Amino acid sequence: MSRGYGLIFSLKVVFTFLSLPHPPGLQGSLDRLQLEYVDIVFANRSDPNSPMEEIVRAMTYVINQGLALYWGTSRWSAAEIMEAYSMARQFNLIPPVCEQAENHFFQREKVEMQLPELYHKIGVGSVTWSPLACGLITSKYDGRVPDTCKATVKGYQWLKEKVQSEEGKKQQARVMDLLPTARQLGCTVGQLAIAWCLRSEGVSSVLLGVSSAEQLMEHLGSLQVLSQLTPQTVVEIDALLGNKSHSKK
């Protein structure tokens, strides 16, 4: 596969104690992608049975072998990321550069309160995912589950239950409350949600899930919305959501 200009390739691996020091399936994934290396390899969820030192050594090995340029974490706690960084410094290994975290209107605390501290202390950035909360933040549900949405796909029963739960209905109501703000900015609620995620300090990119080129282009329109997200607009969004993260100090 040719590396097009501006493209960044990444892979995600899951560690178990038995798989160390070689992350499982990494070479096979590279072969399927027809790539010799990826830009970033993510360690998905810290395995409590795998010593942190061994995980950091394994990721350092991956980079030294030329299989990846950098490594990051996915769904790790701030404490685990800090431990990995400390291990890297102690043993002259390579530390993680970013954390992949869920972030959207209804999942805020980690990206807004925990990761910025790591960004300032050790330079670990954030790559966030699920900006539309698996489709909840699109106003397409409106209290029901359309036949064509992801919630009807096999394996996504949990999403259907989420949509139909009391909490899910409350979140859908908040999405509908945001429609006037989106219209004022000349965008969709989905574009507003993605731009809102991009505004967070330390967030370098937001991962998008699309099923068509048209959907991708629509989501990319959020870049035009980002410049319109003034502090006052963000305050108004926070007031409508009613769930702004606050320091526990």
Curated annotation (Swiss-Prot):
* Designated name of the protein: Voltage-gated potassium channel subunit beta-3
Task: Supply the source organism's classification.
Answer: Eukaryota, Metazoa, Chordata, Craniata, Vertebrata
Enzyme Commission (EC) number: 1.1.1.-
Organism of provenance: Mus musculus
Q: How does it assemble?
A: Forms heteromultimeric complex with alpha subunits. Interacts with KCNA5 and KCNB2.
Keywords of the record, alphabetical order, are:
Cytoplasm, Ion channel, Ion transport, NADP, Oxidoreductase, Potassium, Potassium transport, Transport, Voltage-gated channel
Q: Which family does it belong to?
A: Belongs to the shaker potassium channel beta subunit family.
Q: What is its main location?
A: cytoplasm
Q: Which PANTHER family match?
A: HYPERKINETIC, ISOFORM M, VOLTAGE-GATED POTASSIUM CHANNEL SUBUNIT BETA-3
